[in-house]
């Protein structure tokens, strides 16, 4: 059985607490590796603060201002 995975979602990866995945003080390839681990195409450390990923599957939870629960 073949399985097709849609990968068209971009966004910030989230920690379990609802906060963006921090990349402060991490190695340069940290975000790209984390994004690829989540089946995304690529990613980078936005402003040295949080991991932003490209072309992730729709099932990956990403941070959203509307549903933000970080620090709450």
From Swiss-Prot:
GO molecular function, one term: toxin activity
Protein origin, superkingdom: Eukaryota
Tissues showing expression: Expressed by the venom gland.
Residue stretches making up the LCN-type CS-alpha/beta domain: 9-71
Covalent S-S links between cysteines: 19-70, 23-45, 31-51, 35-53
GO biological process: defense response
Cellular location(s): Secreted
GO CC term (a single one): extracellular region
Cited InterPro entries: LCN-type_CS_alpha_beta_dom, Scorpion_toxin-like, Scorpion_toxin-like_sf, Scorpion_toxinL, Scorpion_toxinL/defensin
Keyword line: Disulfide bond, Ion channel impairing toxin, Neurotoxin, Secreted, Signal, Toxin, Voltage-gated sodium channel impairing toxin
Signal peptide range in chain numbering: 1-7
Gene3D superfamilies, per the entry: Knottin, scorpion toxin-like (3.30.30.10)
Family per similarity comment: Belongs to the long (4 C-C) scorpion toxin superfamily. Sodium channel inhibitor family. Beta subfamily.
Free-text note on domains in this protein's UniProt record: Has the structural arrangement of an alpha-helix connected to antiparallel beta-sheets by disulfide bonds (CS-alpha/beta).
Task performed by this protein: Beta toxins bind voltage-independently at site-4 of sodium channels (Nav) and shift the voltage of activation toward more negative potentials thereby affecting sodium channel activation and promoting spontaneous and repetitive firing.
Protein name (database record): Putative beta-neurotoxin
